[in-house]
Regions:
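N-terminal alpha-helical modules
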Residues: 23-168
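Positively charged n-region of N-terminal signal peptides that target proteins for export
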Residues: 2-10
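Sec-dependent N-terminal signal peptides
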Residues: 9-21
C-alpha cells in the first residue's frame, strides 16, 4: 500500500512533469522552422519555402488574371488571340522550371557546405518570384491603362516585359 507521503510525491511528479512533457518538442520535428536553431540553414530554408509557397499561389492567381485580361481584349471584329494566350501560359510554366534550375546553379556556385547551398537556392527562387510578380503586375497595370477599343492592338507592348532575356 502507498502511504500518504508517497502519494504526495507521485502527485508532485505528475504536476511538475506533465507540463514539461507538453513543452517538449516532438521527436519527428524536421519539417518546421521552429524545430531548428534560429539562423540555421534548415530554419532559413524552411522559412523561405513557406514564403515561396505563398508567393507561388499569389503569382498563379495574378498570372491567370493577366491571361484573362489579354483574352478579354477581343471584340466582335477581333477574335481572341489563342496563340498569345497559349504562349503566355507556356512561357509561365517554362519560366517556373527555369527559375528552379537557375537557382540550383546559384546555390551550388556559393561553394558553401551542408544545407547552405539549398538555402541560397531557396532565397534565389524567392527573389526571382518577387521580380516576376512585379513584371506581371506591371503588365496588368499597363494593359488596364489602354482604352478598351485599343487594347487588342496595343497590349502586346505591355507583355514584352515578361520576356526579359530577349527584350533588353
Amino acid at each position: 500500500m502507498i502511504g500518504p507521503g508517497m502519494m504526495r510525491y507521485y502527485l508532485l511528479v505528475l504536476l511538475v512533469g506533465l507540463p514539461l512533457l507538453a513543452l517538449a518538442k516532438p521527436v519527428d520535428c524536421t519539417d518546421k522552422p521552429e524545430c531548428w536553431p534560429e539562423g540555421s540553414a534548415m530554419q532559413m530554408g524552411l522559412l523561405l519555402n513557406q514564403k515561396q509557397e505563398k508567393a507561388d499561389k499569389q503569382m498563379a492567381a495574378k498570372h491567370a488574371a493577366l491571361v484573362s485580361l489579354a483574352a478579354a481584349s477581343s471584340s466582335d471584329s477581333t477574335p481572341v488571340d489563342e496563340r498569345l494566350l497559349k504562349a503566355l501560359k507556356s512561357q509561365q510554366a517554362a519560366w517556373s522550371l527555369y527559375r528552379y534550375e537557375e537557382c540550383e546553379l546559384i546555390g551550388s556556385l556559393t561553394g558553401a557546405g551542408g544545407r547552405w547551398p539549398s538555402t541560397w537556392a531557396a532565397q534565389c527562387v524567392v527573389n526571382h518570384t518577387e521580380l516576376r510578380m512585379r513584371r506581371i503586375r506591371s503588365a496588368i497595370a499597363c494593359i488596364q491603362k489602354i482604352p478598351g477599343d485599343e487594347r487588342y492592338s496595343d497590349q502586346n507592348r505591355c507583355l514584352q516585359q515578361l520576356a526579359p532575356l530577349t527584350n533588353r
